[in-house]
Amino acid sequence: MYNLDIKPEADKIFRRLSKKNPKQLGIIDKKLLDIRSNPSHEYKFLRSPLQTYNRVHIDTHFVLIFKIDHENKVVTVYYYDHHDKVYDWKP
């Protein structure tokens, strides 16, 4: 299983989400466990200029942006937001 690294921007979002919507945070945790246990699954890459990042839809309206480092066996979570806003994110 790969290790998990959550960037400060995503951590701030998850802390706020734990107070407002803990059910959705549980769904995110379950998806992250799935990603960490099966990182060879073909998760979609984003388009340019974010082409090095992967994405996965959570629930129906939200997107999680992450990267998988196969050399160091680390999944890094960068951002999470509504699908209308998430693609405007600048790393």
What are these regions (language model features)?
Residues K30-V56:
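A short, surface-exposed loop/turn module that caps and links secondary-structure elements
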Residues I6-A10:
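Basic, amphipathic "hinge/linker" alpha-helix immediately C-terminal to the N-terminal HTH DNA-binding motif
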Residues D5, G26-K30:
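PIN-domain endoribonuclease scaffold, especially VapC-family toxins
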Residues M1-L4, R15, K19-P22, I58-V63, ...:
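Enriched for short, Lys/Arg-rich terminal
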Residues K23-G26, K44:
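Short, solvent-exposed positions on alpha-helices
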